[in-house]
Amino acid sequence: MDAATSFGCASKGPDPLWRYLTEHDPKYERKKKLKISGRELASVPTQIFSLDQLQVLEMSPERESCLRYRMELLPQEISRLRNLTCLYVDSNNLKKIPAEIGTLSHLERLTLSNNNLSSLPPEMGALQRLHSLHLANNSLTELPSPLCQLRSLTFLDVSDNKIGTIPSSIRQLEKLETLLLLFNSLDSLPEDVCLLRNLRTLWLGNNHLQSLPTSFGELVNLDWGYNYCSCNFEGNPLESPPPEVCSRGPEEIKDYFLSFHRTQRH
């Protein structure tokens, strides 16, 4: 199974390449992959859980496959696939993730977007090789605590949820480069976010933020050419600092707060 294999849709035959993955990262072109598809499938084929050398598994109805079946529960047997590095189960009807996912110690990418998840199992904190996690468009009301144990994480998307607070433990994600928090219910950010010195992309649009942490200007690695104001802060009732200051980058934000503190002292 050196080339990508398509399970189902026999009339179309196997795909010579799994284009979605190779477009996103050539690193995964030579992986042992499986794409579940087929309009007649009514459940996940149990045979796949005997493929213990499988490295990339896609079970997402709205990708290039013709899969109509939408999972409501990720099978516990997923734990048998100990060599998985990438798991794509977005655009299903998942309401929970089994604790067994914590046994997938080689997992590097996990896509859970467009489901109905309101929590994550504590066992997910064991995924210490995970560097990319997609959780957009779910039903999360807080940033699940297991996420803050994922020390290798460089990309985290929790956009379009109902998240109201960010825990101080987010400071543990020291390698994080991209944090997407758009379309949530945040009315504040902890100062701890400002300790994520490797952040290059931070999207906060369409929340309820009236102010930024006073240390926000310390995030000097933010790519302000890409994170201009309309992307970064649009849709927030910001007052401190005002949007026109934010759009000028970290130095202006730092100067704003320094000036503000001097005024307060006098």
Regions inferred by a protein language model and the residue ranges of each:
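The feature captures the LRR N-terminal capping module
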Residues: 1-100, 104-168, 175-178, 208-210, ...
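Glycine/serine-rich loop-strand microenvironments at binding/catalytic pocket rims
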Residues: 45, 168-169, 174-204
